[in-house]
């Protein structure tokens, strides 16, 4: 009988990261997915990154994950979103060639040390004494294991809706999983329904681009991965068009036929990525909505019209599309649809992504209530790391709100849960100026090195970068000009007769890297790995970062105050019954987590701290 230490079920974005992370830690790992072309499948939009999402990708890369490197092998339209705003909200994004992305992912995974791939369907999991024992395939065969990571995406009791038509499926032309849903229910997990959707696909050869707006990418693509020196994939343009009043009229007239508005769908859809029906209803005063026409590949004429996700009947979809400028004569290749599926209340898992009910069972991705490739991948890498570390009897790996967007996401999910698809935003992070895309490796790679999940190649690149940062920082502190010389150059500084270094100049409003290079041409040679830009940001926002670091220190002190797993909150005096019940239900692991639970008062936190100091001499326990 086959046996693996870790088995990952599902080969989507969460699954591939989980499997690769487990394998990198030297643990024999099996990835089970339905078919080869499922590996890294982009079920919805052909793009990676975006605002906050791009930071997640960079953090995954910092831990030696796959997503950033793979998109650099397949990216055909790179664009830094929000670049006119502050660096805390910059969002690196890349349009992907679907075929190239899947090809690159397949080549990496099929040659990955310690990783085997099995193409098949898991029907059930075997559990004994609340511990994982094995997976059972639909052909009846059994594979033994110590840990299971469920990354099932939209496959748990998945149901596609196109108008009144219902199609049981986890994705188009792929059957759903009922067995795993039933098993999770029998175990006692709280399952609910969520919904997501996708727009129709259209033929780019039938679009009149003269009626659209050109959207070029960045002149020089900025890679996602620290392993990528330069993006060698050909770059192409995207285009923008809009809906019209006629489009809106057709949608309003047919709302009763929409699966979403007819009451046919139980699941709640993503608030921040609404269907076109939702947009027309919720934003009824808007005269138009933008649609981004995104090519799906270099040699693929399929266009993804980002912005018109819908569950309307096919004939209505055809009708409304032809009211959009440039799409009057377009050919629809595949209708849009909504899909609803089961997910587990993420409060059922710990911050390691292991379930609280079953030892050795980990959940990652949409099964935890999230939406988006990047959110799924971020969970996948953490689940894979922790499953492997548990096999090796090593301490778990836990990111926090203070050091990563991944940590923010996991803390949000495990503390608050979610009743709608959770999407990452910069606004969810209290420390977003410190948690930028450009410093992801400086925040996380060393943590990954400490547990052995980072390759030797990345270690060398990271070590070299850290050395270069110190050298360039020293240079910036050496190069200087007098205030009088700066004034002659038109740079406004206080005329105090002192010398101003480049780092001093970076703090001046409207002074930028380009000006520094113009004044000191030798700095042009230091632009490798964007180090100069990084140091510019650190200098420009130094005072804000100092204050934020103080806040982070306070946060970390509370996160370090552990709460015993078996603490009886009903024995703590001066806490109301309501709060005692809430704490008993949530079982917070630290004072910091307890403070973030809705409804927990500062007085209750004080009472817990005093009680712990009285009961436990060191104020903490496991």
Swiss-Prot record:
<comment type="function">
    <text>NAD-binding protein involved in the addition of a carboxymethylaminomethyl (cmnm) group at the wobble position (U34) of certain tRNAs, forming tRNA-cmnm(5)s(2)U34.</text>
</comment>
<dbReference type="Pfam" id="PF01134">
    <property type="entry name" value="GIDA"/>
</dbReference>
<dbReference type="Pfam" id="PF13932">
    <property type="entry name" value="SAM_GIDA_C"/>
</dbReference>
<keyword id="KW-0819">tRNA processing</keyword>
<feature type="binding site">
    <location>
        <begin position="10"/>
        <end position="15"/>
    </location>
    <ligand>
        <name>FAD</name>
    </ligand>
</feature>
<dbReference type="InterPro" id="IPR036188">
    <property type="entry name" value="FAD/NAD-bd_sf"/>
</dbReference>
<dbReference type="InterPro" id="IPR047001">
    <property type="entry name" value="MnmG_C_subdom"/>
</dbReference>
<keyword id="KW-0285">Flavoprotein</keyword>
<dbReference type="GO" id="GO:0002098">
    <property type="term" value="P:tRNA wobble uridine modification"/>
</dbReference>
<protein>
    <recommendedName>
        <fullName>tRNA uridine 5-carboxymethylaminomethyl modification enzyme MnmG</fullName>
    </recommendedName>
</protein>
<dbReference type="GO" id="GO:0030488">
    <property type="term" value="P:tRNA methylation"/>
</dbReference>
<dbReference type="InterPro" id="IPR002218">
    <property type="entry name" value="MnmG-rel"/>
</dbReference>
<keyword id="KW-0274">FAD</keyword>
<dbReference type="InterPro" id="IPR049312">
    <property type="entry name" value="GIDA_C_N"/>
</dbReference>
<feature type="binding site">
    <location>
        <begin position="269"/>
        <end position="283"/>
    </location>
    <ligand>
        <name>NAD(+)</name>
    </ligand>
</feature>
<feature type="binding site">
    <location>
        <position position="122"/>
    </location>
    <ligand>
        <name>FAD</name>
    </ligand>
</feature>
<dbReference type="GO" id="GO:0050660">
    <property type="term" value="F:flavin adenine dinucleotide binding"/>
</dbReference>
<dbReference type="Pfam" id="PF21680">
    <property type="entry name" value="GIDA_C_1st"/>
</dbReference>
<keyword id="KW-0520">NAD</keyword>
<feature type="binding site">
    <location>
        <position position="177"/>
    </location>
    <ligand>
        <name>FAD</name>
    </ligand>
</feature>
<comment type="subunit">
    <text>Homodimer. Heterotetramer of two MnmE and two MnmG subunits.</text>
</comment>
<comment type="similarity">
    <text>Belongs to the MnmG family.</text>
</comment>
<dbReference type="InterPro" id="IPR044920">
    <property type="entry name" value="MnmG_C_subdom_sf"/>
</dbReference>
<feature type="binding site">
    <location>
        <position position="366"/>
    </location>
    <ligand>
        <name>FAD</name>
    </ligand>
</feature>
<dbReference type="InterPro" id="IPR026904">
    <property type="entry name" value="MnmG_C"/>
</dbReference>
<dbReference type="GO" id="GO:0005829">
    <property type="term" value="C:cytosol"/>
</dbReference>
<dbReference type="InterPro" id="IPR020595">
    <property type="entry name" value="MnmG-rel_CS"/>
</dbReference>
<dbReference type="InterPro" id="IPR004416">
    <property type="entry name" value="MnmG"/>
</dbReference>
<keyword id="KW-0963">Cytoplasm</keyword>
<dbReference type="InterPro" id="IPR040131">
    <property type="entry name" value="MnmG_N"/>
</dbReference>
